[in-house]
Each structure stands twice: as C-alpha cells, then as structure tokens.
Amino acid sequence: ADTNAPLCLCDEPGILGRNQLVTPEVKEKIEKAVEAVAEESGVSGRGFSLFSHHPVFRECGKYECRTVRPEHTRCYNFPPFVHFTSECPVSTRDCEPVFGYTVAGEFRVIVQAPRAGFRQCVWQHKCRYGSNNCGFSGRCTQQRSVVRLVTYNLEKDGFLCESFRTCCGCPCRNY
C-alpha cells in the first residue's frame, strides 16, 4: 500500500505531482476506450446512460456527474450509519477525481472521459475541525463511506469497478 494514500478520495496530494501521472496520452486512450463502449450500445436519446449495457459501467457507473447529487454521498444513505442529529460543521464540495487509492490502498486511474460523455463526480463532506460545535464532551469525527467507481487498467486496457473511500459526514461523538 502507498504511504501517500490520503484519508478520503479527492484529498490526494497534488504537491507530489500525482496529477501528472495521468498524461495526455493516457487521457486520450481512456477517451477512445469509453467512446468505443458508447458506440457499442447503439442507443440514442437522453434520459438513460449510453454505457449501461457494459457490465462494469452498469455495476459501477452510478456517479455520473450529470445525475449525482450531494446527498448521494452522505453517510446516512448507507448502512450501518444512521443520520446523526448532532453534526459539526461540514464543508461540501464536488470533485472529479482522475486518480485515487482503492480501499486496499492501491493507486488507480479513475475514468474521466468528458469528450465521450462520461464523467464521474463525488461529493466530499469534510469536517471543518476549526469550528467544533460538539459541546464540551463531544468530538467531531470524520466519517467515511465507500463509493464504487469505474477505473481503467492500463496494463490490460480494460475497465474495472473498484471501491474508494470518500469523506461523507461529521457526527459528534462522546468519548
């Protein structure tokens, strides 16, 4: 596992030049591969995905930017979390990750193919620890949940469906 792996998706340290690992050549290769999937579908028309006939995209393509909403990546939408009544302040932002670390800590290129019409977005719900509204006894805890995203395997020239951790909420916990 890579020691640079951050707590949550979209927190990858840009300072290490990691963004440069996804070169224009790699981006072009991914675009072409995604275009090929779209062409296979033979489907035209709006309202449903061009990619749903492909098993990996069907299983894993739920975070298309055009349909994903902030609440899709909130913890309380996933078992075993329940919606905590007291939550410390959260900053919410969306991102389009081009790479990340899987739950197993493995570095992956995440599929982004804007030209082919497939972009993946994840909303981060990160604790703003500076303003801790949990009272005197509680503490703000960063919750994480798992999202499944389409990745691209450069060695095998193929798509995979893989799990990543994303920051999803900040319940107050008593210790």
UniProtKB/Swiss-Prot annotation:
Expression (tissue specificity): Hemolymph.
GO terms (BP aspect): hemolymph coagulation
InterPro entries: Coagulin (IPR000275), Cystine-knot_cytokine (IPR029034)
Top-level taxon of origin: Eukaryota
Disulfide feature: 8-167, 10-95, 60-161, 65-121, 75-168, 88-140, 127-170, 134-172
Xref: Gene3D superfamilies: Cystine-knot cytokines
Keyword Iron found: no
Protein's UniProt keywords contain Disulfide bond: yes
GO cellular component terms, semicolon-separated: extracellular region
Any Pfam family hit: Coagulin
Location, primary (coarse class): secreted
Subcellular locations according to the entry: Secreted
Keywords (A to Z) from UniProt: Disulfide bond, Hemolymph clotting, Secreted
SUPFAM superfamilies xrefs: Cystine-knot cytokines
Record text on subunit structure and interactions: Coagulogen is cleaved after Arg-18 and Arg-46 by a clotting enzyme contained in the hemocyte and activated by a bacterial endotoxin (lipopolysaccharide). This cleavage releases the peptide C and leaves 2 chains of coagulin, A and B, linked by two disulfide bonds. Coagulin molecules interlink to form a gel.
Function: Coagulogen is a gel-forming protein of hemolymph; it hinders the spread of invaders by immobilizing them.
Family: Belongs to the coagulin family.
Protein name according to UniProt: Coagulogen
Organismal lineage: Eukaryota, Metazoa, Ecdysozoa, Arthropoda, Chelicerata
